[in-house]
Amino acid sequence: MANDFRFGVGMWGARSRSAWQEKVRRAEGFGFDVLQVPDHLGAPAPFPALLSAAEVTSMRLGTYVLNACFYKPALLARDVEALDRLTDGRIELGLGAGYAREEFEAAELPFPSAGERIEYLGHVTRYLREHQPTVPIMIAGSGDRIMTLAAHHADIIGLTGGRSGSTAADPLAERIEFVRTAAGDRFGELELNIVITAVPDDASGIPDLSLTRRHAPTLSDEQLLALPDVLTGSPRDMADELRRYRDSYGITYFSVQQQHAESFGKVIAELR
C-alpha cells in the first residue's frame, strides 16, 4: 500500500471553455494531483470536461463517480479507451451505483433496487477490467455489497467516512477492516481514498459544515465535527491529522470539493 499522499479536487460547472480551463489551472496551482468531475444530470458531461482540462494541466484526470447504471459496458469501455489515449494515459475511472431516483427518471431509465444497481456496477466493472485493464478503477461507497465489490475489483477504495447508522466505536476503521478482510492478499495493493467535506477557510479553525450536513442532516454540529471527513484547526493541525489517517488507517489519498480547494491547498503545502 502506498505511503505517499495524493490529493484530488472535485470540480464542475463553468460558463465557457476558457473559464473551465482557468479553474483547472488554479486547482493545479494549489498542489492537487487529480482532477475529479462528477456525473450528474444538470452538470457538464464528465468526459468532455476532462478532455478540455487535459489541454491545460498535467494532473491526472478522474471521475468521482460515474453512475455505472447510465452506461452500457462496451460503449463505456470505448469512450474510456479514447479518453485515456487522448490524455496520454492519465485517466482514473471512479464508479458508483447511482442513488438519485430523479436522475434516473429524467434520463428515462428504470430505477432498480440498490442490490440490482450494485450487481450492474459489478457487471460494468468486470467488463472494464477485461477490456481496459490499464485504467485504474475507483469504487466508492459504504455498504457491505459495494465494498466487497471494490475490494475484489478496484484499485482505489472510495471511503465515505464510515457506514451510515454504524454502531462501531470507529466506523471508518470498521469499514477499512471490512475491506481488508474482503480483499485478502490484494489489500496491500489497494489505495484508500476519503473525501473531506469540511475545511476551515479562515483563521478561526472552524469549518463550514454545510456540505457535511447535506449528507448527515440529523446530526448536531458537535456530532458533525467529530466525523472523519471533517477537519478543524490550522493548516498545520490539519496536516498532522492527515498524517494520523495515513499512519492509523492507511489512507493516503484525500479529496475535497472545489469550494475548499484554496484552503486545502495550504494543507497540501504542509505535507509536501
Where are these regions (language model features)?
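Active-site-adjacent structural elements that line small-molecule/cofactor binding pockets in enzymes
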Residues: 1-272
